Design a protein with these regions (language model features):
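Active-site-adjacent substrate/metal-binding segments within catalytic domains
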Residues: 213-388, 405-440, 515, 520-528
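Polysaccharide-binding and catalytic clefts of secreted carbohydrate-active enzymes
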Residues: 283, 293, 301, 307-358, ...
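Active-site clefts of carbohydrate-active enzymes
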Residues: 342-350, 406-416, 508-523, 556, ...
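Substrate-binding cleft of secreted/luminal carbohydrate-active enzymes
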Residues: 442-446, 450-452, 599, 614-666, ...
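Aromatic-rich peripheral "rim/lid" segments of glycoside hydrolase catalytic domains that contact
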Residues: 464-477, 645-696
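Glycoside hydrolase catalytic-domain groove-lining segments
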Residues: 524, 528-612, 627-634
Length: 696
């Protein structure tokens, strides 16, 4: 029931704010509160003096509890307006962050939508405003595709919409830990949008826009490569620098702290807690903190199909660079679902810079660079030809395919069915390939198995099992659990509010039960599913490589139930944490060592079109952000390492897999290090052991 507070002032503010604006949706007479779609929420009318508001109470079982407000006639045309706004009041007992997302068809939280947010203390009112950021549509832009970001337009199509085709609004609380209550007054739009003037000669002047090195033509910046001679000069300068600065003098051969405490040496990497802080311990018994970078390998390739006018002096037209054509499968974006022809500008640049033996030379250089830069780990998705040189400790990457859980969904694909015998079989077949390579290798810290898989909320995988076909192994396992608990289908029906005629009827059904009524059973099976996942992998890893660590699955989107399951079986639990700081990160499970598998920062001052997931203003701010992030992890008692994503920038025109074209490398597409970032790496890496030991 809504609180008894008076809304008069609240609604008066809304009315004043509406001056010169248009009400898009109000909650007065005729609004059907009972037909508002909800996710872990309930709604009702808050009828007070001065008008009505929408009262919303949210739970904390879903990742994004809230409501959906659909356009009454299928879509709203908001093209005349600059923003959407709503007035909200926190009527709950807890501080709340409210989000309002404006959607086009196909909105996924990143593309085809724009989002605004507002944080309110208990009793506080405020206005949540969402800028109706348009998808860029200049004459040249209409000819561009297949990238996350576009020239001169930070973020490109991400966080942008077609304002003429808005289909719905989502009002939600992101990943709450407690229940919330809030009220929303009339939703309105305002501001007169003025489209940019057309530039009739723009297209002719714009193309081609990528030079022979894969760089943006229409801009210059510090460090841009203008000739092969510049590449050679930078190579010579870097060789001198690496000779003068070979690496921290107090490290042992592994990158552990030779000058620090000596613990038990086992000949392999392990974990130990010392004076309240978790550490890795290197094979010689020295403290080791994993400071590394992902993707130490050849650069990603970029699609070239349909882009013939984009390139100036395209290297692929020369016989000596024709070897860098390839084909790749696209998972997301313009080329999604297709195998497309692509080209490796980075490889062509490496051949120009290092000669015909470029692969061997860049592999050798990677080890020398990392040591000099204060890094001691070759991290995920790196080239075995590089890390099996056994000069820098590394982690190995394990991926495999088995039958999916058909009712599941996720950004990178469906979850696999851990109860299907094929899961364990394919896992062990893949790990067997590491025999004689990483398995038993003292330089191998351990294994990441999988990456950013879709854990959903605390019951999602149980619901996915029920939504799967009758021959799904997980579904049969779940129903067996229910039979053991309830015995008769009638007892299950009474508990869940269902009307299945028999257990076979439940097996045949693909309908999801009422979440609230079935919660305890759904949560119990989710726990069983998650623990089975981690147990099977732990057992397989330890059978093939008993001396290597199981480093988990690199959580990106995870609930507490899955995180606690990981703690039971992983030696180290891994997270990909894209944020400014991890100093205050709180793990929901028991005291376990943690490792960061991915993080990055990017800017638009070096010719790239997208900042990546955590934007910064420029390279100076990028360096400062790097230092602050890693030192925050060093102060945290549970973190035993941070791995930057990634070694090289992504292609200017987007990688094949998913169109990413982020400025997130330690080196650019011409293999030129970013000096500001490298200086930050050195500052942090060369002092990290004393810094961590002395922290609190």
């Amino acid at each position: 029931v809504p609180s008894a507070m008076t809304l008069a002032t609240f609604l008066c503010l809304a009315a004043l704010a509406c001056a010169g604006e248009k009400v898009l949706l109000d909650f007065g007479e005729g609004f059907d509160f009972g037909k508002v779609p909800t996710t872990d929420a309930r709604v009702c009318e808050a009828k007070r003096e001065g008008g009505s508001a929408l009262h919303v109470e949210t739970g904390h079982r879903a990742e994004w509890p809230g409501i959906t407000l659909k356009a009454p006639k299928g879509k709203w045309d908001l093209s005349p307006f600059e923003f959407l706004a709503l007035d909200a009041k926190n009527v709950g007992a807890n501080k709340v962050t409210l989000c309002c997302r404006v959607d086009n068809p196909g909105a996924d939280g990143v593309r085809n939508c724009v989002t605004g947010r507002l944080t309110l203390k208990p009793g506080e009112s405020g206005t949540l405003k969402v800028e109706l950021r348009r998808k860029p549509r200049s004459a040249a832009r209409n000819k561009l595709f297949g990238m996350r970001g576009y020239p001169g337009e930070p973020g490109g199509d991400e966080g942008a919409i077609d304002a003429a085709g808005v289909t719905q609004l989502l009002i939600f609380v992101p990943r709450p830990k407690e229940a919330h209550a809030f009220e929303v007054a009339a939703i309105r739009v305002g501001g007169a949008y003025t489209p940019p003037p057309p530039k009739p000669d723009e297209e002719r002047a714009f193309f081609p826009f990528i030079d022979t090195f894969g760089q943006y033509i229409h801009r210059d910046w510090p460090g841009k490569t203008h000739s092969v001679e510049e590449l050679k000069a930078r190579l010579a300068a870097e060789a001198k620098e690496l000779e003068e600065r070979p690496g921290p003098p107090d490290w042992d051969k592994w990158g552990g702290w030779a000058a620090g405490p000596t613990l038990k040496a086992t000949g392999f990497f392990r974990v130990e807690k010392l004076d309240g802080k978790w550490w890795l311990v290197d094979p010689d018994g020295h403290l080791f903190w994993s400071h590394g970078t992902d993707c130490v390998r050849e650069n990603d390739t970029t699609p070239i199909e349909g882009r013939e006018t984009w390139w100036q002096d395209f290297p692929g037209e020369r016989p000596e660079f024709a070897e860098f054509f390839s084909k790749g499968h696209a998972l997301h974006g313009h080329y999604a679902g297709r195998t497309v022809r692509s080209y490796g500008f980075g490889q062509a640049n490496a051949k120009r810079k290092y000669g015909d033996d470029w692969r061997a030379r860049i592999a050798d250089l990677a080890h020398r660079r990392l040591r000099s830069w204060g890094m001691n780990t070759i991290a995920n998705w790196s080239d075995p030809a590089v890390y099996l040189m056994r000069r820098t400790p590394y982690v190995a990457t394990i991926h495999f395919q088995s039958r999916p859980l058909e009712g599941s969904q996720g950004y990178w694909g469906k979850f696999r069915d851990v109860f299907d015998p094929e899961f364990n079989k394919k896992l062990r077949e893949r790990l067997a390939q590491e025999a004689g390579k990483s398995a038993g290798d003292p330089w191998c810290i351990g294994y990441f198995v999988d990456n950013e898989i879709a854990w959903g909320d605390e019951v999602s995988l149980a619901i996915a099992a029920l939504a799967s076909p009758p021959d799904q192994a997980a579904k049969n396992a779940f129903i067996a659990d229910l039979k053991a608990k309830y015995g008769a289908i009638e007892k299950l029906n009474a508990a869940w509010g269902t009307s299945h005629a028999s257990w076979d009827a439940l097996l045949a059904s693909r309908a999801a039960p009422d979440k609230k009524r079935a919660w305890d059973d759904l949560a119990a099976f989710y726990t069983r599913f998650a623990e089975e996942y981690f147990r099977l992998i732990r057992d397989a890893v330890k059978e093939v490589a008993p001396n290597q660590l199981y480093l988990g699955c690199r959580f990106a989107w995870v609930n507490d139930r899955a995180a606690r399951a990981a703690a039971k079986f992983c030696d180290v639990v891994s997270y990909n944490l894209y944020r400014r700081s991890v100093a205050d990160f709180r793990y929901p499970g028991p005291d376990k060592p943690l490792i960061i598998g991915e993080f990055h920062f990017g800017a638009l001052d070096r010719g790239m079109f997208h900042t990546g997931l955590v934007p910064v203003k420029d390279q100076a701010e990028r360096a400062a952000a790097y230092k602050a992030y890693v030192q925050g992890a060093l102060r945290h008692p549970q973190f035993v390492g941070t791995h930057w994503f990634k070694y090289s920038d992504e292609p200017t025109t987007g990688r094949v897999l998913d169109e990413e074209n982020y400025q997130i490398g330690l080196v650019d597409c011409c293999d030129t290090p970013y000096p500001e970032t490298i200086a930050a790496l050195r500052e942090v890496g060369h002092t990290m052991y004393r810094y961590r030991l002395d922290a609190w």
